[in-house]
From Swiss-Prot:
Protein name: Large ribosomal subunit protein uL16
Keyword Zinc (UniProt): no
NCBIfam families, A to Z: rplP_bact (TIGR01164)
Source species taxonomy: Bacteria, Pseudomonadati, Pseudomonadota, Gammaproteobacteria, Aeromonadales
Family designation: Belongs to the universal ribosomal protein uL16 family.
Listed PROSITE patterns: RIBOSOMAL_L16_1, RIBOSOMAL_L16_2
Region of interest (Disordered), ranges: 1-24
Biased composition (Basic residues): 1-17
Domain of life: Bacteria
Quaternary structure (record): Part of the 50S ribosomal subunit.
Function: Binds 23S rRNA and is also seen to make contacts with the A and possibly P site tRNAs.
């Protein structure tokens, strides 16, 4: 699963996830893409599950790019622990997602196959998505 090798700080503030994606909002590497249309956060497990679903459906032909990386630690306290006594331990990593962000890209496969693969991947994710095709200028 994806997570940073090392970070400057172990734990972060919760923060807010506002606005629209102004970087990573266009298909750059492949021909087809899966773009988020809603706001949320994707866990490293969700990103990996979607990647596996796509890879298996296209039978490892073509190329897949993952355009998101979970670099925000989420902490949790153990069950039945009283409030206070410091911030909990890092349990998993997430990537904050804003509407317009391209999550995955694919190339080297027919459009129909790419649509099917992205539909399988979208079912594994906690944000709404749409299928996009690279615009040629």
């Amino acid at each position: 699963m994806l997570q940073p090798k090392r970070t400057k700080f172990r734990k972060t503030h919760k923060g807010r996830n506002r606005g629209l994606a102004n970087t990573g909002n266009e298909v750059s590497f492949g021909t087809f893409g899966l773009k988020a249309t809603s706001r949320g956060q994707l866990t490293a497990r969700q990103i990996e599950a979607a990647r596996r679903a796509m890879t298996r459906h296209v039978k490892r032909q073509g190329k897949i790019w993952i355009r998101v990386f979970p670099d925000k630690p989420i902490t949790e306290k153990p069950l039945e622990v009283r409030m206070g006594k410091g911030k909990g331990n890092v349990e998993y990593w997430v990537c904050p997602i804003q509407p317009g962000k391209v999550l995955y890209e694919m190339d080297g496969v027919p459009e129909a196959l790419a649509r099917e693969a992205f539909a399988l991947a979208a079912a594994k994710l906690s944000v709404q998505t749409t299928f996009v095709i690279k615009t040629v200028m």
